[in-house]
Amino acid sequence: ACGLDRLIGDPRWCLHPVQVMGAVITQLRLWAEAIGGDRPWALRLGGGLITAVLVGGSAAAGWALEQLSLHSPWAVPLLVIALASALAGRSLRLAVEDVLTPLSSAPPDLEQARRKLGWIVGRDVEGLAAPELLRALAETASENAVDGLFAPLFWMLIGAGLWSLNPALPGPLALAWAFKASSTLDSMLGYRRGRLQWLGTAG
């Protein structure tokens, strides 16, 4: 899975599991806000249900594919592809290189570097000088390396350990997708503003 991620990364033409998770979160959020209104307790309950549905559903989908791969050899390549989809090492490396390339040109193309950096950070990058751009790039690269590479690998290892004890237990894909679901929830709902301060509590 790591080799596949390094080789092809996340092709833009291919539907990514995180895109599906994001679409589900968006729809469930609309329903939760329509039903809960501005009542904190109702929004917290709705957020808890969103978290349970998304994390539980992602883990269940991963577990189902794992079980299928145990009994159907043709499903093994699908399992490997699914595991690779939980990793973002190549995508992160390319995103970092997209910022470093204009910075290393002579003279540095700061405007291009700011534009590329703006795609991967959640802060205002206008007016940043080269040292500040590099600092912001280093910060976001380290954060995304945890969320996109090291944490999924950690949960894959835990899942592999569980699988070795009993193949019926959740394995590497189930735990990796559950983590990606919780990470996506945090990035979309984990804000202390408006209704999200209650809706995003569980996520």
Language model: regions and residue ranges:
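Hydrophobic alpha-helical transmembrane segments
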Residues: 1-203
